[in-house]
Amino acid sequence: MTTVQPPGAATAPEPTTRPEALSLLGAAARHDPYAFYRTLRAEHPLLWDARLEAWLVSRYADVAPALAGSALAGPRRGPCCGPGTVRCAEEYTAPESAFALLREVCARTAHVLARRLAGRQEADLVEEFCRWLPTGTIAAATGLSYAAVMGRSGPAPARSRAEAPAATDLGRGRGGTGVALLAARCADQAVLTGRALASLMANLLANPEQLELIRAVPALIGQAWEESLRRNPPVHVVLRRATSDLAMSGGTVPAGAAVALLVGAANRDPDRFADPDRFDLHRTTAGALALGPVDCPAARVAELQAECAVHALLTAMPGLRAADAFDPAESGLLTRAPHRLLVRPS
């Protein structure tokens, strides 16, 4: 039996199971994408998905260089960076003072949201905190309404970076125009950051010993953020098109073909990360495919929001723990995150 191929495919991997039954749009992938990813990595590192009409690429050794290289073309519009981006494409450079002031805005916003939950018997962190903090921070910093920011934000916005608001439209925000411009440039990532925050809190609540370590050593929040982005990235699938023939494990993607780079699979590849399903904030292996490179303003803002979020929650709710009905089940296809996180604030 050979892999189902599109017309004109160059070469394809030799499967050990029925590849035609495997699809990113199938029930198995929806039910447990991580088990689906394991099957792909082990048996079908390059698989033609007839339903998706794209090649699925699942191994880290293939996904990472493909994301960083120039053989795959992506959309011309959207966020400046994404998983695996080596260098930020954003020409705007924010001064360090803008990041510091934006952190102050984010910290105030996070503490307001956290205090609202502190006296409750039970709360949903996704609905009442994680979704609000990134957008609320941007709204406060820019002077734009929450609805206006939400209208700009999304995992794949259909507008160019040049469409950011003009400085004259941002004078009502806290911290001045510099902070407002930085926040506005990061609005595209607000929804993704909210999903990443939900995954971070899910990982910490599911690992109480590591949550206690964070309480004792808040400086570890950054490491926890990086590890959560590896284990549960907000972006699971990056869609691209091959501009030339591209060699992968098990075959070659022909020029012009659609390619689905499975970031969620690559970040749990045991050939790259030891015990990849485990959340370990002391993990030292670098190279996780996350939100963007270190020089990306949006990635830096997302990290400072994560630090402010965890600090505010643990300050306002020293006894924060998972509720009895805690079930951090993820949902989504291209992007994934828990849709509910029930906790006991006290």
Residues covered by each model-derived region:
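Cytochrome P450
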Residues: M1-S346
